[in-house]
Amino acid sequence: MGAGCVKVTKYFLFLFNLLFFILGAVILGFGVWILADKSSFISVLQTSSSSLQVGAYVFIGVGAITMLMGFLGCIGAVNEVRCLLGLYFVFLLLILIAQVTVEVLFYFNANKLKQEMGNTVMDIIQNYSVNASSSREEAWDYVQAQVKCCGWVSPSNWTRNPVLKNSTKTTYPCSCEKTKEEDNQLIVKKGFCESDNSTASENSPEDWPVHPEGCMEKAQAWLQENFGILLGVCAGVAVIELLGLFLSICLCRYIHSEDYSKVPKY
């Protein structure tokens, strides 16, 4: 390998590791977001889905190690440190294997996540209290208000709640209440509301002034959109990792041959 080719390889490897470092930060940030988000469907899933939490911690670990390896790769490439490049290659290969494993698990557990979300939402609805004081009740109120939906499949899911089931007045979940289209300010109401102009003798969902759509389809679209973005980022990182592996091998072989040529021969 000529000196000019080696120089190009060094700086290409440096550039790839810089991108690698940035994408590692994105993966780490995604894992932190899964754990910290309290205002979307993720916050509802966290209460029951251990697989989602495990996946989040894996993303944080992989992202942190990826950033470290990107840093080591930059130093090893610029200074031609063979031991650093070898260490970089080994860890990069392990990261790639772990990353592919997590992606496969997320892909094949998509239906399980959807089922877990449905079970969690129905449990929240059935046990929803008048004060709505728990974190998961507050999270579901936020979801219904933000996405403009009510219940899981439909608003009638709320009839399983004892408070609404036993009410003789037109009582409904406040976070489901319809808002004016021109009102862009998000106001999240909690608990149950009573209709002022109620004339019905029983509490029927048909009489509720709420959004008619359930949240299931919107939740599925949300999951597909966000996990699609995640898989796209991970695929981009995987391509950079493969290029990094190839370039690190080339540079390691060159450094080894250069060191060997400097050994005096008798």
From Swiss-Prot:
Cite a GO CC annotation. plasma membrane
Question: Per UniProt, which keywords does this protein have?
Answer: Cell membrane, Glycoprotein, Lipoprotein, Membrane, Palmitate, Transmembrane, Transmembrane helix
The positions flagged as glycosylation sites are: 127, 131, 157, 166, 197
Q: How is it modified after translation?
A: Palmitoylated. Palmitoylation contributes to oligomerization and surface expression.
Localization of this protein: Cell membrane
| Cited Gene3D superfamilies | Tetraspanin
What spans does the record annotate as topological domain Cytoplasmic, numbered to this chain? 1-11, 73-83, 250-266
Q: Where is the lipid attached (S-palmitoyl cysteine)?
A: 5, 74
> How does this protein sit in the membrane?
Multi-pass membrane protein
Q: Which InterPro entries does its entry note?
A: Tetraspanin/Peripherin (IPR018499), Tetraspanin_animals (IPR000301), Tetraspanin_CS (IPR018503), Tetraspanin_EC2_sf (IPR008952)
Extracellular side stretches: 33-53, 111-227
Q: TM segments?
A: 12-32, 54-72, 84-110, 228-249
Q: Assembly and partners?
A: Forms homooligomers. Interacts directly with IGSF8. Interacts with EGFR. Interacts with VEGFA and PDGFA. Interacts with ITGA4. Interacts with ITGA6; this interaction reduces ITGA6 cell surface expression. Interacts with ITGB1. Interacts with TLR4; this interaction inhibits TLR4-mediated signaling pathway. Interacts with TLR9. Interacts with PLAUR.
Role summary: Structural component of specialized membrane microdomains known as tetraspanin-enriched microdomains (TERMs), which act as platforms for receptor clustering and signaling. Participates thereby in diverse biological functions such as cell signal transduction, adhesion, migration and protein trafficking. Acts as a attenuator of EGF signaling, facilitating ligand-induced endocytosis of the receptor and its subsequent desensitization. Mechanistically, modulates ligand-induced ubiquitination and trafficking of EGFR via E3 ligase CBL phosphorylation by PKC.
By sequence similarity, the record places it as follows: Belongs to the tetraspanin (TM4SF) family.
Protein name (database record) = CD82 antigen
Provide the taxonomic classification: Eukaryota, Metazoa, Chordata, Craniata, Vertebrata
Q: Which gene encodes it?
A: Cd82
